[in-house]
Amino acid sequence: MANVVENLGKLERRVTISLPKDAVQKEVDSRIRQLAKNVRMPGFRPGKVPLKMVTQQYSGQVEAEVLSDKVGKEFFDISRSENLRVAGQPSFAPKSDATEGDYAFDATFEVYPEVKLGDVATAEIERTTTTISEAEIDRTLDILRKQRVHFHARGEAGEHGDGGGDTAAKEGDRVTVDFVGKIEGEVFQGGSADDFAFVLGEGRMLPEFEKAATGLKVGESKEFDLAFPEDYHGKDVAGKTAQFTITMKKIEWPHLPEIDAEFAKSLGIEDGDLTKMRAEIKDNLEREAKRRTQAIVKNQVMDALLKISELDVPNALIEQDQERLVAMARQDLEQRGVPNAKDAPIPAAMFKEQAERRVKLGLVLAELVKANELQAKPEQIRAEVDEFAKSYEDPKEVVRWYYSNQQRLAEMEAYVVEANVVDFVLSKAKVTDKEVSFEELASATAQA
């Protein structure tokens, strides 16, 4: 008898599965006999429980297992014989109008869609490029110097003393203060501290607090009002105004290291050569620029492919991906040390839009890769592994680490496939180049 696959919508299908009751009962009887060999019941030795008692106790459970197994197998056979590309898991529901002597179930499921790829030549891509200038190297050196800043008390005697012991605190200084804050005359939790140090201008403190400390000299005090923002992390004081008293105890000025041989050595340049140091910084910036520009271009390519492609997305796959994203979110919370992260009430609905895009993009990429033979070649995978391994002390060990684990290798393969897709689209699409500074590039990718 031919199987009739009903079309319930764009992707939803239904097929009826019939199972002869005598075949089901035969399998149930066989499994119960096997079960009886080991089953335990009070008053009987193992394997000596009467078959009738085993049947009474377990027949319902065994019958459900047999039906589940047979329905699943029958559905698999039907989907294969009818060339059905089933997306996700089917749902089975028993039918009340089954033919006498049969069990009948409706299997409802979705199929993978037909993906209509648009003309890649119509896609428009803006390719971001950047050139590392000497000014960018200088800016990076300034950042590296600030990361190695150390402080000296104003008026300190010695090599770094600045003779400004009576100088008022200004931006960039590290200040040490005592403070007391009150709301309606009462000191609140976290509202007071002694010998509290922070750097003016870093934004660690609220603007009103930094403004009050700026301009004070050692030994001076100041009273001021501070309005906590409505969204302040301390819920007990959010939206309230406190009265603070602050006393300046110490002012230290920032001493940045000179760009010399010792500084170069601190960056890993063994002989302290400044030219080598600048070349090393340039290489690092170029690698980082390449990574960031590739990420921007990849996102543009993926957006363009979605824009020119037509397909319906199976809800079953969206729901599966939503659950994956929920699991990833819980794992992220757990890694951050959030208590009971595994049971965090994260609604899957918040990931629906993201999941739909991911599934849709996955289907489009699969079709594009298949149609244009963009699969990753072994030599491409090895080349990427070798390139990644270069940045480690023992590249051979990193290569071995990759090839010893199929999951890691599969991740690299996926990366290569994406790179093949990007290269393919860029070779066909309308591409315009846009030159930006490294600073603009870093800002753009940070906001993405």
Curated annotation (Swiss-Prot):
Residues 172-257 form the PPIase FKBP-type domain. The lineage of its organism: Bacteria, Pseudomonadati, Pseudomonadota, Betaproteobacteria, Burkholderiales. Belongs to the FKBP-type PPIase family. Tig subfamily. GO terms for biological process: 'de novo' cotranslational protein folding; cell division; chaperone-mediated protein folding; protein transport; protein unfolding. Its EC number is 5.2.1.8. This is Trigger factor. Pfam families: FKBP_C, Trigger_C, Trigger_N. GO terms for molecular function: peptidyl-prolyl cis-trans isomerase activity; protein folding chaperone; ribosome binding. SUPFAM superfamilies: FKBP-like, Triger factor/SurA peptide-binding domain-like, Trigger factor ribosome-binding domain. Coiled coil: none annotated. It catalyses: [protein]-peptidylproline (omega=180) = [protein]-peptidylproline (omega=0). It is found in: Cytoplasm. Consists of 3 domains; the N-terminus binds the ribosome, the middle domain has PPIase activity, while the C-terminus has intrinsic chaperone activity on its own. One of its GO terms (cellular component) is cytoplasm. Keywords: Cell cycle, Cell division, Chaperone, Cytoplasm, Isomerase, Rotamase. PROSITE patterns: FKBP_PPIASE (PS50059). PANTHER family: TRIGGER FACTOR CHAPERONE AND PEPTIDYL-PROLYL CIS/TRANS ISOMERASE, TRIGGER FACTOR-LIKE PROTEIN TIG, CHLOROPLASTIC. The keyword Protein biosynthesis does not apply.
